[in-house]
Swiss-Prot record:
Gene Ontology BP terms: cytochrome complex assembly
Function text: Required during biogenesis of c-type cytochromes (cytochrome c6 and cytochrome f) at the step of heme attachment.
Membrane-topology descriptor: Multi-pass membrane protein
Keyword Acyltransferase: no
Organism: Trichodesmium erythraeum (strain IMS101)
Protein's gene: ccsA
Lineage start: Bacteria, Bacillati, Cyanobacteriota, Cyanophyceae, Oscillatoriophycideae
Molecular function via GO: heme binding
Descriptive protein name: Cytochrome c biogenesis protein CcsA
Length: 351
């Protein structure tokens, strides 16, 4: 079997499947009443994931080292990670809207690797001496998985911002679930655009109320008095989310938090492994190389995100903006440094 031809075929097939999957997800978002589109989207993403895994396996057999040593290999490894995390997120949330945002990114990365990179960068070459280490798999693979996880989590935060754009949304569910009940409030929308929340406590007061005697000026009969004041809040109809969109926003907020919570420890482990490897290879744990600096910036951004959510109880728009910032920082750390700068990680630089 010609492994080189197999790899070339698989990278083109992966791109084609991801492109078709992206269109399916977009059609599903435009026409949600067509039931089989969501199944086709998930199936397409799973097939693309399998094709990329086979491509990486063929490259491993051909080159005899784990395929994350150059930009082409790392791009497809990143795409495989994104499709894997996508499938996990979709299964956890039950929201097919996830694919509307993740499939274009996965397709774009595979297109860049398969169609844009020069052919000489797509072939396997012997490892440079600095990469002939067991730390290659440990450090680079964990870093790439953290990038994939953080990218998907940040994408879902961006999706939250898009869905709730220009609208005031207050989420009151727990950050640890995907379908939390907004504090058991019964919410009903009235025609005069008044939002009325009736809490279980009010119902309990009504049920358990015992009348007490009160004299009136007109007669001396004993009457029962219970005065209940219901407070309503007038809300501009333009800022009210429909119950369906509010539920989707809640799911996206929660699942984004959980995925970023998975990606952050992976990033931490990857940075620590890289520091140990750097000490073995270059005699220093930290040298403020551009890649190291941006990895630290990435870590700080997502550390701030998790700190705000865990200790400050942030939900909704504020942490989503932090995650969206992290999305840009991850790409600078991964591609920007390699494409636009030189340093100890210059083996990926080609511009």
């Amino acid at each position: 079997m010609d492994l080189v031809k197999l790899q070339k075929s698989l990278d083109n097939i992966s791109f084609g499947i991801l492109f078709a999957t992206m269109l399916i997800y977009w059609l599903g978002a435009a026409f949600p009443r067509i039931p089989y589109l969501s199944i086709l989207g998930s199936t397409g993403m799973a097939i693309a994931n399998l094709c990329i895994a086979t491509l990486l396996g063929a490259r491993w057999l051909e080159a005899s080292y784990f395929p994350i040593s150059n930009l082409y290999e790392s791009l497809f490894f990143l795409t495989w990670g994104i499709t894997t995390i996508h499938l996990i997120a979709e299964n956890m949330s039950g929201a097919r809207l996830v694919g509307v945002f993740t499939s274009p990114i996965a397709m774009g990365i595979s297109a860049f690797a398969a169609l844009t990179l020069p052919s000489n960068m797509q072939i396997s070459e012997p490892l440079v001496p600095a990469l002939k280490s067991n730390w290659l798999m440990m450090h680079v693979s964990v870093m790439m998985l953290s990038y994939a996880t953080l990218i998907v989590g940040a994408l879902l935060a961006i999706a939250f911002l898009i869905i709730t754009s220009g609208q005031k949304v207050e989420l009151s569910g727990s950050s640890f679930g995907t379908r939390s009940s907004r504090n058991n409030h019964f919410v009903k929308y009235q025609k005069n655009w008044q939002l009325q929340k009736e809490r279980p406590l009010l119902k309990e007061i009504k049920n358990n109320y015992k009348p007490f005697p009160q004299s009136t000026k007109n007669d001396h009969s004993q009457t029962s008095v219970l005065e209940i004041t219901e407070v309503t809040q007038k809300v501009d109809p333009e800022i009210i989310l429909s119950p369906e969109r509010l539920n989707i926003a809640q799911i996206l907020d929660n699942i984004s938090y959980r995925i970023i919570g998975l990606g952050f420890p992976l990033l931490t482990i990857g940075i620590i492994a890289g520091a140990v490897w750097a000490n073995e290879a270059w005699g220093s744990y930290w040298s403020w190389d551009p890649k190291e600096t941006w990895a630290l910036i990435t870590w700080l951004v997502f550390a701030a995100y998790l700190h705000a959510r865990i200790t400050k109880g942030w939900q909704g728009r504020k942490p989503a903006i932090l995650a969206a910032t992290g999305f840009a920082v991850v790409w600078v750390c991964y591609l920007g440094v390699n494409l636009l700068g030189k340093g100890l990680h210059s083996y990926g630089w080609f511009l």
